[in-house]
């Protein structure tokens, strides 16, 4: 198996050159989420549970953003292999129009009916009242985030992974500073509490959008052809919908599944402790997965570009095998490191910092151990689904393999243990991670067939 790791000189330098900035970008983004959680936790566990519940529908918006972004990257990475700037501009134009429409409507719903939506997600009305002001504003921020994320995705697919890292570093510093000022009322500003976190995020997203707009006009690496951007044509719309709509549905269904896990925890007898522990460990788990997300995104760029360049079927297969084995080994190393930190750092230092004591700390420990043990499985499935299958244009199977195990295994098993059997939280934590046990072998079987390799830039003639 390790024989496949032998590659031409410079390959791993190139791989890490793509992975590093993307991983740092994800680290910055997840650190922002962690800082949000930390500052809100200082207000109390009830406030943190309210924000966690409010973020359930927001996570669906994030999933839509990521879905459109991923659909765009499929086309851009392969067109970049051909250096076809006109079609790249058309693809970005279609993505911007569709993405705006897909985020404006849910953002409006969240703004108009925040309490009613919150009441659907928890049996605790106090959380709904506390979280509503946050929910009203945070939805609007993702309209701007959609547009900036699309431009970042296009730059990344054109092998410029550093742009997103710099943009989100700037945004994170701004957001964190505004969080501190507006949540706690520093420097003469009003103490807005939870609502302050939403205002800070909205202002940071608007700034991101402004910077991306300026760079899109001035960029030499990826010069957008504005005529093609504003008039992308029906052929590009058809092609984008064909390859991106399954990805958008995939991410939306996956996001809904993750949101349902939070809803299940919100209906347990100890919902405040469950939600508080899940909020903290959700962010900490993602911090350890940033390298895996980076490798997955780098895999998508490399595979997509290779197909666009016209490499042979066997070359692409060998390349995918190398990338997947390497990612799984990196995941195993991260598991060893993270498990060492549970008794030495998380339990004695991190959990008290987030005001997690007693039952909340015990639940967080269970979520930490089960989550960290699953990192190699998550690492493989991230690269398999978002890197190999999607970049190869195999969007139907990538959707089925990503969503199926979650909805058919993890969700019903977690609901059964948490709500019906009232099982111990260790069993519930294990059930949350169970989808990867099914996803990994199914992904491996699909990739082994080689039927996932498609050149999505080729226009088929009528009658063919």
Stretches with model-predicted labels:
Residues 29, 33-36, 40, 62-69, ...:
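Alpha-helical transmembrane segments and their lipid-water interface positions
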Residues 27-49, 118-125, 181-192, 252-287, ...:
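Helix-terminus/linker motif at the lipid-water interface of multi-pass membrane proteins
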Residues 1-22, 76-141, 189-245, 303-374, ...:
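Short alpha-helical transmembrane segments in multi-pass integral membrane proteins
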Residues 69, 73, 138-157, 164-172, ...:
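Short runs within selected transmembrane alpha-helices of multi-pass transporters and secretion channels
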Residues 17-36, 137, 171, 204-208, ...:
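Transmembrane helical elements of multi-pass membrane transporters/channels
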Residues 7-38, 42-43, 59-71, 75, ...:
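N-terminal transmembrane alpha-helices
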Residues 48-108, 145-164, 275-342, 379-398:
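Small-residue-rich hydrophobic transmembrane alpha-helices
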Residues 22, 26, 37-38, 74, ...:
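Transmembrane alpha-helix boundary and packing residues in multipass membrane permease domains
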């Amino acid at each position: 198996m390790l024989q496949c790791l032998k590659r031409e000189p410079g390959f791993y330098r190139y791989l890490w050159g793509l992975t590093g900035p993307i991983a740092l970008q994800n680290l910055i983004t997840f650190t922002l989420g962690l800082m949000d959680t930390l500052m809100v936790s200082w207000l109390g566990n009830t406030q943190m549970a309210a924000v966690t519940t409010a973020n359930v529908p927001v996570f669906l918006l994030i999933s839509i953003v990521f879905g459109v972004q991923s659909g765009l990257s499929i086309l851009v990475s392969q067109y970049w292999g051909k250096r076809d700037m006109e079609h790249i501009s058309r693809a970005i134009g279609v993505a911007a129009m569709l993405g705006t429409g897909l985020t404006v409507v849910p953002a409006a719903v969240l703004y108009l009916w925040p309490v009613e939506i919150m009441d659907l997600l928890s049996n605790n009305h106090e959380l709904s009242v506390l979280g509503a002001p946050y929910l009203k504003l945070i939805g609007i921020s993702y309209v701007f985030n959609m547009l900036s994320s699309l431009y970042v995705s296009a730059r990344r697919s054109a092998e410029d992974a550093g742009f997103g890292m710099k943009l989100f570093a700037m945004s994170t510093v701004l957001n964190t500073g505004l969080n501190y000022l507006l949540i706690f009322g520093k420097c003469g500003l009003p103490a807005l509490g939870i609502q302050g976190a939403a205002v800070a995020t909205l202002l940071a997203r608007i700034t991101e959008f402004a910077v991306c707009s300026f760079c899109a006009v001035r960029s030499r690496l990826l010069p957008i052809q504005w005529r093609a951007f504003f008039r992308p044509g029906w052929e590009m719309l058809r092609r984008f919908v064909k390859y991106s709509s399954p990805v958008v549905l995939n991410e939306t269904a996956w996001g809904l599944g993750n949101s349902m896990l939070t809803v299940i925890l919100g209906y347990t007898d100890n919902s405040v402790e469950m939600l508080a522990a899940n909020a903290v460990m959700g962010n900490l788990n993602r911090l350890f997965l940033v390298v895996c997300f980076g490798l997955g995104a780098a895999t998508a760029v490399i595979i997509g570009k290779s197909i666009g360049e016209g490499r042979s079927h066997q070359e692409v297969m060998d390349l995918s095998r190398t990338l997947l084995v390497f990612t799984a080994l990196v995941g195993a190393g991260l598991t060893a490191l993270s498990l060492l930190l549970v008794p030495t750092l998380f339990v004695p230092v991190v959990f008290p910092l987030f005001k997690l004591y007693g039952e909340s700390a015990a639940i967080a420990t269970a979520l930490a151990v089960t989550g960290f043990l699953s990192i190699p499985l998550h690492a493989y499935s991230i690269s398999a689904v978002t890197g190999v299958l999607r970049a190869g244009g195999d969007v139907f199977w990538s959707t089925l393999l990503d969503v199926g195990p979650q909805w058919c295994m993890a969700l019903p098993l977690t609901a059964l243990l948490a709500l019906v059997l009232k099982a111990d939280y260790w069993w519930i934590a294990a059930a949350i991670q169970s989808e990867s046990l099914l996803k990994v072998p199914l992904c491996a079987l699909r990739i082994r067939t080689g039927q996932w390799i498609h050149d999505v830039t080729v226009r088929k003639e009528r009658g063919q």
